[in-house]
Structure formats: structure tokens, C-alpha cells
Amino acid sequence: MHHFYDQLCPSCAALNYTKRSELADMSGMVVLLTGGRVKIGYQAGIKLLRCGAKLIVATRFARDAAERYAAEPDFADWGDRLEIFGLDLRHIPSVEAFCTHLLKTRTRLDAIVNNACQTVRRPPGFYEHMMNRETAALELLPANVLQLVGSYETLRSVAPSRPLGEDGIVAPKLPAAEAINVPGLTRAAELSQTALLPEDHLTAASLFPAGQLDQDLQQLDLRGRNSWRLRLHEVSAVELLETQLVNAVAPFVLNARLKPLMEATPGVHKHVVNVSAVEGQFYRLRKTTKHPHTNMAKAALNMMTRTSATDYHDSGINMNSVDTGWVSDEDPVAIAEAKIAEQRFHPPLDIVDGAARIVDPIIDGLNTGTHVWGQFLKDYTSTDW
């Protein structure tokens, strides 16, 4: 048995363990990463920064993300190459505005990693504990946190104008009229508190106990049932649409609108990574009857890759879908804990493994000179769609 993995064969274990720490020289390259605040996305962000890349992270909770990155022991080595923007991918006009901002202020973009996804929908109470931080006056923020969100705060007209670190271009503020129309960009965190369904009014401390966080330092969610267990007739229209927007529509917009910026970046090393899952795979022998809406969204994302990879490859952009592997248990806490107690269950991989997989097309391509494209990648190799 491998010293780290207890559910992988020896050769797979050796490969996965090597990939966990593999880096490449990405000096001077710029990467956009969505969903880079926690779990796989956060670990992917750290890996890219340690490769030397300049990283733009998009997340609903920019200040919380900044605190997490700033707490890393080697923050001083790469903190000046990280920018964090607040963005709610459920609001597509805001995604369009964010793309416009990047097109106006950036001179290159080497990779897009569409990592953000909505698998289990959480009510506002799940995020409430972060709101004081996300709405606090700027002068209350630590200097290292303000450093990371400075461009974002300028964009949404909260902070004084300040130059971007890349080339001295002064970050523009959004016109007041436009700022009102793109709350997913200017008030990304606050939108999480908008109640759209009856269950969104659940604020009981018994469900979201104050001060209790899970292993990913997220609010503990003690609801007895969540999205992962829903069947077709149980999924609300709101959840269906949100899942499609975050998992498929927003990546579509980012890939489409930012293509000119990637085309203006010289080289054939460029990548678009659409983070997918086997739930979106048609050639899979067994399917459960649960979470059809998330399956649909990942299938749609895969079809974007399948359709557009050739077109993007003609511009030196290598587009792939990548499965993260089984790294987490999405079941409600009570069910997950029962499986641990009764079956000693745990996923075969962890979030570092998942992060290594989604950035591997970039890192492996740079290290080997062979950039794969047009593939659905699982376990570091091509698999069926």
C-alpha cells in the first residue's frame, strides 16, 4: 500500500503523488481563476502562484479570499502577483462587465481556469458570518488584505484610484449608472444574502452554528438534506438556473469575451480549463437519479469544450475539460458522518489532488512541450465524453 493513498493502485498512487507537488516556470504569465477562495480552487491558486504566474482570482467573497491567501507562510514570495475581484457568476451582466474591465486594463492572458461551480446550493445563512468583513470600511482591513483587493475596490468605486501593478495603468472606476446595473460585480458578497426561495429564510443557529467551521474553514451546514440528494421533480427553477449560470453560462461568457485578449498573447502555450466532473459524462455505465441539474450543467460545459476546442486551438489556445477526481463527500453532514463511522469511508483523493489535476494541462504542457487540447481529462489522461 502507498504511504499516502490507501485506495489507489501503486502506479496510480505514484503518479498522483508526483503531480501534487509538480510545478512549472510560469514567470510573466497571467491566469484568470474563478472560484479561487476555498477547496480545489484555492489550492490551484496557490500552485499557480508558486509557479510564478500572475493570478487574477474571481470569487463572491473577495476579502475572505484575501485573508486566506495572506495567511500563507510564503505570501511574501508571491503576494505582489495576486489580485482578487468580487464576482457573482449568477449575474451575467456583471460577468460581461468584468470581461470588459480586463480587456481595457490587461495586456495579456495566458490561461483561464473555469473552476467555480455550484453543486450544493446554500441559503444566505450559510454565508452570513462573512458579511461584516466583506462590507467593513476599507481602513479596517489589514494592509496585506487591502493589497490583494485594491484593484477590485477601485473598480467598484469604493477606494481611491490606484495604479495596477502590471504596467502602471490606472484602474478605471465604473460609471455610477453602470455600477447600479452590475451588482454581481459591485456587490458580489451582498447578493449572497438575497432570499430567492422559501428555504433561504432559514437562519436557525441550529443549522448554521456560529463559529463552527468545517475542514475547509467554511460554515458548518447541518441541514438534513441538500441539493446532492434532489431528484428532478424536487429541484426548484431557481436552483436549476443558478447551476446552469455558474457552471456553464458564465464560463461560456468568460471564454468568449476574453478570447481576443488571449489571442493577443503570443505563443501556443495558452490554455482554457473547463473544470468538469464525471457527473456530466454521457458514456458512464451507471447514473444515480440524483442532482440531474448539476449533471446537465457539467454536460453542457463538456459540449462547449467538444465544440469549440478546435476553433480555439487555431488561435494557440488549448481548451480541455478536466475532471477533478473524487475529493469530497457532498452529502449532508449527518449522512457523511454516519458513513465515516459505519464504513470508515473517505474519498480516495483530496483537494490538493483535485487542484493538481485541473492545472495539469498547463503545467505538464509547459514542462513537456506537448499541450493537449480538445479532451475530457480524467486521472491525467483522456477519457470518454
Feature roles, as predicted:
Residues N255, H293, A297:
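Active-site helix of classical SDR
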Residues P73-P93, P175-T186, E190-Q193, L197-P198, ...:
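Rossmann-fold cofactor-recognition segment
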Residues R156-S157, R162-L207, A338-W385:
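C-terminal helical subdomain
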Residues C51-Y69, D80-G86, A111-A116, R121-G150:
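Conserved glycine-rich Rossmann-like NAD(P)H-binding loop of the short-chain dehydrogenase/reductase
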Residues V113, T243, L254-L258, M304-T305:
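Hydrophobic positions on the long internal alpha-helix
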